């Protein structure tokens, strides 16, 4: 669970074969972004598959708690690489769409 505004650093899930990560969003509103792409707003019930080798981050929207189940997909020679923090500019580029 992430408190409002909390996010992890950019990171990469590496694997020689298989691997990756699945996020199952369970509560609140979250943000997911792949390096070089627009951020996505996440809502309960959303599922994100992150291919191995993709630099990304995820966390809570600025004004919402966010919970998800993170599943590390099985693979060979899997490892995580933690990178630089997500800047406020990168994080704040996410636009929240209310239902």
Regions found by a protein language model. Give the residues of each.
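Conserved hydrophobic/aromatic beta-strand scaffold that supports enzyme active sites
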Residues: 1, 22, 39, 47-49, ...
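N-terminal first-folded block
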Residues: 1-14
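Conserved metal-binding segment of the jelly-roll/cupin
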Residues: 5, 42-63, 73
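A short beta-strand-loop-beta hairpin characteristic of the jelly-roll/cupin
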Residues: 7, 17-44, 54
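Histidine-centered divalent metal-coordination motifs
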Residues: 11-16, 56-58
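Residue-level recognition of conserved beta-strand positions in structured domain cores
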Residues: 12, 26, 34-36, 60, ...
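A short, sequence-level motif marking secondary-structure junctions
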Residues: 15, 46-48, 87-88
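Double-stranded beta-helix
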Residues: 57-99
């Amino acid at each position: 669970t992430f408190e409002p505004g909390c996010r992890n650093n950019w990171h990469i899930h590496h694997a020689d074969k298989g691997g990756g990560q699945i996020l199952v969003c369970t509560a609140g509103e979250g943000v997911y972004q792949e390096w070089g792409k627009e951020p996505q707003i996440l809502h309960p019930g959303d599922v994100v598959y992150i291919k191995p080798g993709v630099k990304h981050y995820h966390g809570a929207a600025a004004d919402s708690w966010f919970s998800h189940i993170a599943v590390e997909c099985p693979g060979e020679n899997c490892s995580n690489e933690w990178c630089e923090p997500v800047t406020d500019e990168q994080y704040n580029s996410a636009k929240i769409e209310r239902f």
